[in-house]
Every structure is written in C-alpha cells, then in structure tokens.
Amino acid sequence: MLIFTIPQFFFAAWVMVVSLQMQGYISCIEKERKGLLELKAYVNKEYSYDWSNDTKSDCCRWERVECDRTSGRVIGLFLNQTFSDPILINLSLFHPFEELRTLNLYDFGCTGWFDDIHGYKSLGKLKKLEILDMGNNEVNNSVLPFLNAASSLRTLILHGNNMEGTFPMKELKDLSNLELLDLSGNLLNGPVPGLAVLHKLHALDLSDNTFSGSLGREGLCQLKNLQELDLSQNEFTGPFPQCFSSLTQLQVLDMSSNQFNGTLPSVISNLDSLEYLSLSDNKFEGFFSFDLIANLSKLKVFKLSSKSSLLHIESEISLQLKFRLSVIDLKYCNLEAVPSFLQQQKDLRLINLSNNKLTGISPSWFLENYPKLRVLLLWNNSFTIFHLPRLLVHSLHVLDLSVNKFDEWLPNNIGHVLPNISHLNLSNNGFQGNLPSSFSEMKKIFFLDLSHNNLSGSLPKKFCIGCSSLSILKLSYNRFSGKIFPQPMKLESLRVLIADNNQFTEITDVLIHSKGLVFLELSNNSLQGVIPSWFGGFYFLYLSVSDNLLNGTIPSTLFNVSFQLLDLSRNKFSGNLPSHFSFRHMGLLYLHDNEFSGPVPSTLLENVMLLDLRNNKLSGTIPRFVSNRYFLYLLLRGNALTGHIPTSLCELKSIRVLDLANNRLNGSIPPCLNNVSFGRSLDYEIDPDFGSSYGMVRADQELEESYSRSLVLPLEFELDYSGYLDFTVEFASKRRYDSYMGESFKFMFGLDFSSNELIGEIPRELGDFQRIRALNLSHNSLSGLVPESFSNLTDIESIDLSFNVLHGPIPHDLTKLDYIVVFNVSYNNLSGLIPSQGKFLSLDVTNYIGNPFLCGTTINKSCDDNTSGFKEIDSHSGDDETAIDMETFYWSLFATYGITWMAFIVFLCFDSPWRQAWFRLVNVFVSFLKCV
C-alpha cells in the first residue's frame, strides 16, 4: 500500500492536471455520452459515423461535439444540416448536457418541439445556453412559448421558418440578455412593437417578412445599443424615421425593398458610426445630395434607388467628403451623368450605375480612374461607344454592359486589357463582326454572355483553347456560322452552352472533352446530319436541338442519359419511337413535328411530366400508359392514331392538357374522364420556375473586405447563375394556337378531341371540369343534346362543338359562364332561341351558322311561337318537343326518292300515248342539241 505525504499528494495532483492539459482535455462524462447516443437516432449516419457505442470511445473527440477542455463537459452541439427526415424534437434529449452553451440545429429538418415532462420550461434546464440556431427549419409559432424559459440566451436565430402573425414580443419578453435576434425569412406581419425589454440587442434582423406600418419612437428607436439593423424586404411605409438619430452606435442599416417615401432627412448625418447604408428599392423622392452624408467618415457601402422615379441625385457637391467608399450602388436613380465626387473615391471596388440614363463612352473612364475596381455594373443605360485603354492591364473581375446601344465591333484588345475577368456580359446590344481572338487571354473567365447581338463568323480557335475556365457560354441570337467549335478545343470546364438562333451547321466531336456539360441549347440553327452517338456520354439535364435539319433515328446511346428536358422537335427524325428514356423525376419530352412512325410505346410516360408527340406519322391505338401521378400534359395531335379513346386515360388523374385532335379515333367519349383533374383538385402543384437546370452561386472573395464584418449581412459579392428550363406547352384555344409558358401555363387546363371520328352523345360528366378553360369536340359525329352540365364549367373560356350532329336547344343556364369568349356550335342541327344574356351578348353570328332552326336577336331571326321548331324550351323540361328525329327524317327522305324513281320506270315500261309523247320530246331535245 502506497502512502503519500501532503506535499507528495499535491505534486501528484499537479502532474495529473498537467498531463491532462497536455492531452488537450479529459474524457466526456458517461451521462453525456449516453445522451449523444440517444440523439444519434435523429442524425444522418453520414454525419455521426464516429458516434460509437464503445464505452472506451471519448465523445469529446466525436465529430460535431465540442467539450470544455478542463471539465470535459459538452458545451457545443453542431447538428446543422445533418437531418434525415423532418422530425418533432423532444427537448429533454438535450437535458443531459447541463453545461451546453451552443446548440446549432440549422437546417435540421425540425418541425417543432415538445417535452411531456417539463413542458414550456424545458429550455430552462439548459441554464448556460447562450447560442440557439434554429435557422432554415420548418417550425412555426408553436415553438415560441418554449423560448421565454431560455433566459440565458444571447443569440437566437429563427430565420427561414414558418413563423407568422405579429412580432412575438410576449414570447421573448424574458430574454433580456439577447444581443442578436434573427427573425428573417418568415411570415411575420404588422407593426414592430416597443422593444425596450430587449435593450441589450446589438444586432436585429427582421428582413424578408411582411412587417408594415411606419417606424415610430415606441419601436426600434428604444434600442440604444443597436449596431446592426436589417429591415429589408418588408412593407414598411412612411418617411425615414427621425428618431433613428438616437441610434448613434449603428454600424449597419439596411432599409432596402420597402415602401418608405418622402425626402431623405438630415438626421442621417447624425449616424456617424455607419459603415453600411442601404436605402435602395423604396419610394423616396425629391433631390438627394451627397452633402447629406459627407460627415459619415466610416461609411464604406452606400446603396440608393427609388421605385417612384421621382428621386433625383445631384451630381455636384459643395462639402468635402470624409468617407472613402468601397461600394457605391445607385441603380434606378435617373442619373444622366456620373456624379463628379466619384472621381475622388479611388478605393471603389464595386460600382453599380445600372438602369439609368448614362450616355457616351464606356468603360474606359472607369478602368482608368479606379485601379482597385473589381465589379462594374452599367447595364440598361444608353452607352454607344465601347472603348478600352490601350496600354492598361486591369484587375476587373465582373463587367456587365448588357442592354445598352453599342453597335460597333468589339475592341481587338479586349482580352489584353481584361485578362482577369471572370464574368463578362455584353448581351442585348448591337455588336457586329467577328469575335476578337484576344478573348483567349481571359484565362479566368467563368461566364460569358454575348447573346442578342449581330456577331458573325465562326468561333476563333484561340478562344476555344485559351478560355479554359469557361463554364457558362451564351451565344444565342447572333449570326455565328460553321462548326460550333473548331478543332482543337479545350473548354473542359464547360457546363452550359446556349447557342440557339444562329447559323451553325455542324456539331463537331471536340465537345466530347467537356465532360461536365449539363445544359446544351442548339435549337433554331441549320444543323444537319444525325444526332452524334457520343451525346450519350454526357450527364445531360437539358438537351435541345429543335428547329434544325437533323434526320435519322434517335441513337440508342441517348436512351439511358439522365434528362430533365429533351427537345428533338421540328426536325426530320424518323423510325419508331424508343420504348423509354431515362428521365429524372418530372421530365419533359418534346418529339413533335418530325416523321416518327409506328405505335406509341406504353412506357414513355415513366418519370415524365410532359409528352409531346404532335404532328408525326404515328399509328395504332393509344396504349394503356403506365400510371404516373405527376403526368400533366399529353399531346398526340396530328397523327394517324385509331381505335377508341382508352379508359386507361382516366387513370392519369393529374392531367391538365389532353390533346388528341386530328387523328382517326372512333367510338364514344369515355364518361370516366371526369376522374381526370383538369385543375379541379390540385393535389400536385407545379412550380412555374420548375427545373433549375444549372444552379451556381459564385462569391468574389476579394470583395469580402468591402462589406462590414456584419453578423446579419452577407460578407461577399455574389453572382447567381441559376438557369431555368423554358417549359412550353402549345395548345389551341379561342380559335388560335398559343404557346403557354412561365406563369401562363400554370392556369391552362384544356381538352381537345377535335377532328376525329367520335360518335355518341357528349357525356354529361364533362361538366365536372370546373377549372377547364378550353374544350374542343368539333369536327366529329357527336349527337344528342348540348349537356346542361356545361353550365358548371365556371372557368371555361372556349367551347367548340361545331361540325357535329347535335340537336335540341342551347341550354339557357350557359349564360352563367362569366369567362366564355368562344361558344362555337356552327354546323349542327340545333334549334330554339339563342341565349342573349351575360357573355353571350358579345358572341357573333359565326358561332351559330349552319343551324337552320336557331333563332334570336344574335342572328336577326325572329322566333315564331306557332312553330314548334322555334320555341325556346325550358332547360329543366324532360320533353324535347322541338327536337327533330333525324333517323325518321332520313328514312322518309330515302323512301320518297325511291318511290318516285320506281313509278317513273314503271311508266316507261307500258305502251301508251304518254310514253310515245315522252320519247318524241326526247328526240326533239336531242335534235336541238345537235343543231346548236
């Protein structure tokens, strides 16, 4: 047995402490290790793979866990972006961590909190919790009552959730230690209340909500310690708050994208700690002089614009400016000249003077005056001369001169002057001539947009070799010709190529080297030959070669490419359709206006949202398609399809547009079509911005220092390169053929069975399509009555029943249709009075021609009460008194003609004076003809 003296004991203890410190920290306690293992069930295994059940495993060394180095207690849990499925969190799971200071559940998939034992007091068990990040989850107001118990909180982040209603002051009143509060990106509304109890707040972010009203003394102005305030993207109104003059510690103020109005007051000059001031996208008016902010010596970022077009910025100033700006943003300010004071702002790194009335020469003046400039945005002005300094080599990264009035050749030295450019947008101008070969010196260029100009010729070989970092290239709407890329080509980083509406004739195989290509748009060129088989080597999301001269069959290599959109329309492709394509979820397949033949494969609808096979040479019957609840658009018009309309179409319940026109379909219309939605029940709602095909956001790291080190604002200048599929549906409605895209297709629901061989009555069940906007059953052999149930088509705009054999009256209740523009029943056998109320007043006579028994003021034909054929029938009567029995009519007509001819023949068979007289008459007539 060892016996230690007191000095020896303290020495041993000291050695133990030192050894532990040398190890970094002691092991975590067992209670917390078990607590972490309970949490593991809610964390994606990918992020908790080292959370081991082994009792020898030190949880302080586990990923996403932070422990105190001295006590070994867990003080930080960083579970952000680790969820597997949306969950309701039991807060008692965190109770073992009594020393917890930071709990990061950002993007954790949390839908709410609960604690069956401690209830709303649950967070009070975490007495040292200082930072709680619940950003970008799915929680609503149900979590708010839990917050008052967390009185130790200094940072509370709730942005990007589903909070709604007014500012939750009641639930936050006990959080008197809060220094940062982020409620951005929710659904909060109403005025901002008094916040005196949150007097320690340094940073407050209320952006991207719908807060409204004016800002008075009882609200934000009580927060004297406030350093950062973000009110952007709300609905605040009224003038700039005078009481903001008391917020003397304010360093960041963002009031952009609201409805603030009036003139900008002098109190802004009192905010002498400001580094970042954004007043853009409001309704300020009057004259603004930079003298107003001349004394803000710390100001680095200034942004101002107005929605009202009544804001005018004075170009000249009288005071000496004390600030040295890094960022100036004056878009939408009605500027006719560059403000003179900018010449002294040599530290500028970002200039945005877009959407003004600037003219003259650009961008040489800016490049010569601002050696530190990294971003120059001058889009939508009236510059006419594109000039660059001859000997200067500039470090500019971003240049946007789109939508101006340049109409000359691009400078030959553009690549020499701008070798560091990464983003260049010269679109929507009138640039002419060939592409300068000096583009090849832009080794860092990532994005190049030359679309909508008059550029011509072929792409230079040096360009295709030198721009090795190019990822997005837009050449559409020019006059480029020849091969798309000459050999050799080293655009290995190319992901997006948009070159539609040019005169290219050939796709060369050098494109094989661009392995990351996901978006290829080559429509409306003069491409010839077949689709290259090596297209199958790409991981395509978007491929469009429509409106070219391509022919042959679809190469089998394309069948397994993961498309989101494939458009081969308006070419000369032939052969049978493949049995399937490997579409991602909700793909778009356009094969219309080709020469495809054979049957329609039943498997084509797998993972497809739209199938367009219009105007081919397809034959056979419509197959029983594989069921697909996401399938919305089926377009088979203009083929040679035969047989009945299959009842299996009724299983495609989400259909919005069904076009089977101009085929040879026969039989009757299936009544079960009322199972199809046509917008009646939108169980599945499509986003009009569906299908982001390529999405990239790039930040310019060198601009980071241009923004204040803000807790609530982005630190970088970012460019969003998201691209969207042009989702288009062509459909005949209101006597014309229209293309629906963007927001418009969201409201298009239609059915077209016209120009077939359909018979039988129109099913009354078609009246269940309450949201349908266009219904065309014309040019068939449909019989019976116009269904009275059509009065239930409350959103209908166009009904075409022309060229059928319908009879009976036009139901009077159709006058209830408030949006009807076309009601064409011409060339039928309808009878009775034409309705003349509501929208029917504006319908002209062409809608009714070919119906001899119709009458009314619309066709200027009176109705005779004594003629049963002209009587208006009670739409609710079961007896059709005016209806003509067409079968009896045709049999009577046939019998009359038959009996007449038989009598005439019998008459000629008997010898009589009448017979002799008849033959003499015939002889006289023949002699007369000979004389003539």
Swiss-Prot record:
Cytoplasmic side: 910-932
Annotated protein name in UniProt: Receptor-like protein 9a
Gene Ontology CC terms: plasma membrane
Family per similarity comment: Belongs to the RLP family.
Subcellular compartments: Cell membrane
SUPFAM superfamilies: L domain-like, RNI-like
Keyword ATP-binding belongs to the record: no
PROSITE patterns: LRR (PS51450)
Glycosylation site residues: 53, 80, 90, 140, 261, 295, 352, 380, 420, 425, 454, 524, 551, 560, 666, 675, 776, 792, 824, 829, 860, 866
Membrane topology: Single-pass type I membrane protein
TM region positions: 889-909
Annotated Gene3D superfamilies: Ribonuclease Inhibitor
Regions of this protein lying in the Extracellular compartment: 29-888
Main location: membrane
InterPro entries xrefs: Leu-rich_rpt (IPR001611), Leu-rich_rpt_typical-subtyp (IPR003591), LRR_dom_sf (IPR032675), LRR_N_plant-typ (IPR013210), RLP_Defense_Trigger (IPR051502)
Classification via Pfam families: LRR_1, LRR_8, LRRNT_2
Keyword Methyltransferase: no
Entry keyword set: Cell membrane, Glycoprotein, Leucine-rich repeat, Membrane, Receptor, Repeat, Signal, Transmembrane, Transmembrane helix
LRR-type repeats, residues: 97-122, 126-152, 154-174, 175-200, 202-222, 223-246, 247-273, 275-295, 296-320, 322-345, 346-368, 370-393, 394-417, 418-441, 443-466, 468-491, 492-514, 516-535, 536-560, 561-583, 585-605, 606-629, 631-652, 653-676, 745-769, 770-792, 794-817, 819-842
Organism of derivation: Arabidopsis thaliana
Signal sequence range: 1-28
